[in-house]
């Protein structure tokens, strides 16, 4: 399988979400020696914010774009092409102030494109076009919020990923990262166990 791993933490190797991603990558290489893994680090190589210039470029007909607009669209096209090419897409996401990092939001704004990754049917029903992908979200947070109203990350990502066709994401979270060393170790250990089970093929609960 072709796996695309998208990192979004600003902390580099100190990031707990990256540590989970590294663990998953290690397990995948063991279980799928013939597979390929591509990593995109949104902090090391940021995606530009979706601004007026970007919107203008995307909504200008291809034969009328300036050279600058063509470059903007080409950058977005490259991000989208990675998604279509992958069989499995992994998002490593830290929770910042109850939400996702700005880097990941910028990425989502660049790849959620009408007529490209989603469309509306004649009946006005949205249809995601990134189909038949395995989707995994590895998150880490300082406190504990899974299954409570304070967890705003899970419903948002389930909604926006599903909108572009990335349905039934498996969420694996390491919680309690800022609640002391023992709590952090326990949270990471539990998340790694779930990653091991996922790679081994054990059934996983997906977001509702």
UniProtKB/Swiss-Prot annotation:
Assembly: Homodimer.
Alphabetical list of Gene3D superfamilies matching this protein: 3.40.50.360
Family membership: Belongs to the azoreductase type 1 family.
Listed name of the protein: FMN-dependent NADH:quinone oxidoreductase
Organism listed in the record: Bordetella petrii (strain ATCC BAA-461 / DSM 12804 / CCUG 43448)
Catalytic activity: 2 a quinone + NADH + H(+) = 2 a 1,4-benzosemiquinone + NAD(+); N,N-dimethyl-1,4-phenylenediamine + anthranilate + 2 NAD(+) = 2-(4-dimethylaminophenyl)diazenylbenzoate + 2 NADH + 2 H(+)
Essential cofactor(s): FMN
Residues given in the record as FMN binding sites: 9, 15-17
HAMAP family: Azoreductase_type1
Cofactor remark from the record: Binds 1 FMN per subunit.
Residue runs in coiled coils: none
Pfam families noted in UniProt: Flavodoxin_2
């Amino acid at each position: 399988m072709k796996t695309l791993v998208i990192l979004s933490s600003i902390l580099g190797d100190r990031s707990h979400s990256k540590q989970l991603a590294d663990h998953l990558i290690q397990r995948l290489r063991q279980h799928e020696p013939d597979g390929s893994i591509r990593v995109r680090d949104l902090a090391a190589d940021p995606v530009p914010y979706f601004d007026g210039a970007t919107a203008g470029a995307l909504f200008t007909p291809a034969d009328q774009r300036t050279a600058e607009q063509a470059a903007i669209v080409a950058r977005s096209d490259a991000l989208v092409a990675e998604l279509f090419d992958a069989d499995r897409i992994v998002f490593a996401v830290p929770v910042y102030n109850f939400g996702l990092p700005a880097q990941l939001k910028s990425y989502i704004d660049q790849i959620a494109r009408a007529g490209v990754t989603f469309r509306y049917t004649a009946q006005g029903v949205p249809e995601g076009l990134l189909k038949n992908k395995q989707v995994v979200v590895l998150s880490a947070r300082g406190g504990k919020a899974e299954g409570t109203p304070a967890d705003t990350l899970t419903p948002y990502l389930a909604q926006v990923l599903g909108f572009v066709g990335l349905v039934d994401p498996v969420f694996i979270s390491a919680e309690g990262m800022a609640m002391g060393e023992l709590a952090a170790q326990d949270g990471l250990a539990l998340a790694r166990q779930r990653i091991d089970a996922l790679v081994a093929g054990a059934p996983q609960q997906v977001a509702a």
